């Protein structure tokens, strides 16, 4: 009996070469029992030779998060945060994995839809950190969600680098594991008022959404206005999910302020802009908040219609070589979808900080927290340094749509373009 078996897939090329060099003939002359023993031994040898390779495969770094994929938070979450998480994981894995103190390990993202619901968000993070015991977490979108999950960061000992939360109350809670990447309400409104003063504004009107974000920014604006010589001649709150702002805008138009300020979310930002155009309200300065920095705003309003509109923004592709590389990579992965010119950059900066921290100290979360808290970080948006939970290195900024780009116009040391102090007519 002659048995012809290709053992290469089992025992590797080396053993197969021995057969080719003469062992094959000897094998044929062996009794059947001996042949079986040779085959069994060879198979065992092959498995043993594979064992080191199997054991050498590094465990993935499991990183969990909840993100709005449905509900009213979706517009912000799916522009400013989740695309950046996906891009980061893809880039890191393509480079061999996350560097954990010199060992490259693949990233495994574990995520779910928080449905724009605070309770769902809290339950998800409790599970991720409490029972799933993921290695790291990434934050959810928005001030309300982050306010709810921030205490969990401290309870479970997981560093959070939050790129879309504005809240002085979060800073005052003194949570050592929670870090806010965005400029907070006071520096942002201080920059806005400084810009107004430098350009001769005497009167302003303000509307604000009646939630944590709107209330804190409105309060910060009132503080910033003290001693400025600028008078607030109208101030109105509105409920989340508002569908019509035209009565408020008509009343403001009648008072003819030099500047309009809206502490608004993306749907309200677009609503206020569209309805201001409809009622013919076109002050010298028109400033809205979240969403103004989005490509969506330019697309909906058209580049000509967005021209001169100001809002919360802090970077664009001109800010740094790293910012341009990030912008180009984002557009390549998500064709036709640009990162927004505010929180997207801060999201990426947070991922840069996390990457550098894990490389330096590994996955020891206490050591990682200490690294984040005590390091002056170099990022695409510039230096980031924390005092407590607050990023104190990134100054307040104002941006403005000019020729299809959301340009940083204040302060002048960070400007990517000169300010246009007279908004053109809506188009």
Where are these regions (language model features)?
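C-terminal segment of N-terminal export signals and the immediately downstream linker at the start
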Residues: 12, 25-32, 50-66
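N-terminal secretory signal peptides and thylakoid transit peptides that target proteins
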Residues: 27-45
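Extracytoplasmic "Venus flytrap"
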Residues: 64-88, 112-118, 141-144, 207-215, ...
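Beta-alpha junction/loop-to-helix N-cap segments that form part of ligand/metal-binding clefts
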Residues: 76-80, 98-172, 181, 238-245, ...
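Extracytoplasmic ligand/sensor domains, especially the bilobed periplasmic-binding protein
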Residues: 83, 134-236, 284-310, 317
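Signal peptide-proximal N-terminal region
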Residues: 83-108, 227
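Extracellular/periplasmic periplasmic-binding protein-like sensory domains
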Residues: 273-348, 358, 412-416, 420-426
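Segments of small-molecule ligand-sensing domains
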Residues: 330-344, 351, 355-410, 414
């Amino acid at each position: 009996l002659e048995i012809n078996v290709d053992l290469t897939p089992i025992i590797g090329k080396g053993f197969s070469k021995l057969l080719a060099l003469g062992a094959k003939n000897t094998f044929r002359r062996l009794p059947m029992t001996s042949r079986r023993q040779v085959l069994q031994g060879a198979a065992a040898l092959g498995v043993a030779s594979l064992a080191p390779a199997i054991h050498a495969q590094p465990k993935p770094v499991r990183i969990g998060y909840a993100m709005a994929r449905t509900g009213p938070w979706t517009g912000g979450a799916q522009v400013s945060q989740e695309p950046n998480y996906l891009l980061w994981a893809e880039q890191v894995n393509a480079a061999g994995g996350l560097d954990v103190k010199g060992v490259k390990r693949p990233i495994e993202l574990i995520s779910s839809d928080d449905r724009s619901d605070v309770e769902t968000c809290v339950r998800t993070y409790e599970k991720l950190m409490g029972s799933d015991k993921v290695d790291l977490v990434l934050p959810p979108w928005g001030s309300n969600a982050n306010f709810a999950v921030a205490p969990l960061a401290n309870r479970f000992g997981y560093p959070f680098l939050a790129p879309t939360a504005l809240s002085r109350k979060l800073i005052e809670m003194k949570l050592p594991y929670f870090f806010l990447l965005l400029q907070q309400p006071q520096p942002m409104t201080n920059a806005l008022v400084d810009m107004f003063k430098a350009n001769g504004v005497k009167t302003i009107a303000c509307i604000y959404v009646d939630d944590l974000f709107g209330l804190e920014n409105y309060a910060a604006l009132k503080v910033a206005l003290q001693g400025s010589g600028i008078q607030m001649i109208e101030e109105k709150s509105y409920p989340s999910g508002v569908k019509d702002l035209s009565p408020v805008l008509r009343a403001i138009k009648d008072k003819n302020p030099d500047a309009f300020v809206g502490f608004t979310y993306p749907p309200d930002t677009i609503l206020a802009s569209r309805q201001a155009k409809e009622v013919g309200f076109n002050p010298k300065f028109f400033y809205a908040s979240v969403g103004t920095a989005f490509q969506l705003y330019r697309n909906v309003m058209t580049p000509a219609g967005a021209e001169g509109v100001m809002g919360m923004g802090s970077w664009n592709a001109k800010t740094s070589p790293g910012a341009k590389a990030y912008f180009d990579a984002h557009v390549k992965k998500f064709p036709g979808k640009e990162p927004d010119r505010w929180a997207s950059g801060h999201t990426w900066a947070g991922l840069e900080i996390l990457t550098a921290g894990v490389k330096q100290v590994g996955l020891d979360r206490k050591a990682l927290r200490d690294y984040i808290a005590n390091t002056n970080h170099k990022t695409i948006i510039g230096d980031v340094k924390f005092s407590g939970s607050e990023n104190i290195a990134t100054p307040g900024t104002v941006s403005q749509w000019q020729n299809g780009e959301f340009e940083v116009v204040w302060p002048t040391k960070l400007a990517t373009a000169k300010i246009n102090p007279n908004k053109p007519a809506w188009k």
